[in-house]
Amino acid sequence: MIRKILQTETYRKWEKKLKDPRARKMITARLYHIANGLFGDTSPVGEGISELRIHYWPEYRIYFKQEGDIIIILLCGGDKSTQDKDIQKAKEIAKRVEVDEL
């Protein structure tokens, strides 16, 4: 089953700022795998939010929540150096975002 991946504006802005084309390709490939049900290296961070780890320097993190079996909402992204701040931001965004808004 292919999952639908939705992105918040915060996530889109973060991804657009990435200057490293290899990192962008790695993230795109990882999202393709997720859409096909292959989540790989993920870990729950609380309040229904999970962290997707991309093993590339710097170690990128993408925060998401899943609603049902078909929708994944990309809340925000960052790297290891901003991890704590990004987790808090993801939790705040998750509280106010609605699937039908994306």
Regions found by a protein language model. Give the residues of each.
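Enriched for short, Lys/Arg-rich terminal
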Residues: 1-4, 13, 21-24, 39, ...
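Short low-complexity stretches enriched in small and charged residues
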Residues: 20-21, 26-32
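Generic detector of well-ordered alpha-helical segments enriched in charged/polar residues
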Residues: 12-15, 28
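A short, surface-exposed loop/turn module that caps and links secondary-structure elements
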Residues: 29-56
